[in-house]
């Protein structure tokens, strides 16, 4: 359960910048996908989940330095395969080396990455892009056990 929590929800806040970027309030459901491809290291993960009995709420909020990885470090590599299809490969840091955790493909529907397979990092969720710039990617994950 801890691994699932760390792997799945860690992507809530995949951020590659230590700079603050202010954006105008925009309700547009489209994004500029030209910045989506690349390697994105986890900077902050925050969230909560209900335990199996749904009586206890487990919360977490931790930070990582993607430039100095340690045992909690994670990253994803996003590559464009065709016009609207992307591969997402996830990695975790183990010892002194990055280990592949899984690979998925998906398409963009507005700001949502609709995954074709759910056996990788986003096992129970289709991530929603909250922020995307050339140096910052913020994803929101809401688990959906029906996937």
Which residues does each PLM region occupy?
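Bacterial N-terminal signal peptides that target proteins for export
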Residues: 1-10
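Bacterial Sec-dependent N-terminal signal peptides
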Residues: 3, 16-43
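N-terminal compositionally biased, intrinsically disordered segments and leader/signal-like regions
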Residues: 4, 34, 40, 56, ...
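Short consensus segments that form the blades of beta-propeller domains
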Residues: 30-31, 56-68, 95-97
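Tryptophan-anchored aromatic micro-motifs
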Residues: 32-61
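Contiguous, well-ordered beta-strand patches that form the walls/edges
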Residues: 46-51, 68-140
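Short glycine/acidic-enriched loop and turn motifs that connect beta-strands
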Residues: 145-146
């Amino acid at each position: 359960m801890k691994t699932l929590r760390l792997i799945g929800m860690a992507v809530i806040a995949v951020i590659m910048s230590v700079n603050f970027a202010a954006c105008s309030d925009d309700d547009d459901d489209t994004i500029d996908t030209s910045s989506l491809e690349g390697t994105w290291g986890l900077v902050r993960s925050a969230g909560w989940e209900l335990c199996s009995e749904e009586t206890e709420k487990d919360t977490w909020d931790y930070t990582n330095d993607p430039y100095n990885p340690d045992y909690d470090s994670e990253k994803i590599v996003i590559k464009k395969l065709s016009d609207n299809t992307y591969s997402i490969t996830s990695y975790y840091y183990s010892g002194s080396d990055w280990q592949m955790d899984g690979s998925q493909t998906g398409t963009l529907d507005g700001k949502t990455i609709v995954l074709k397979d759910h056996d990788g990092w986003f096992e129970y969720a289709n991530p929603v892009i909250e922020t995307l710039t050339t140096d910052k990617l913020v994803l929101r994950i809401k688990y959906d056990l029906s996937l």
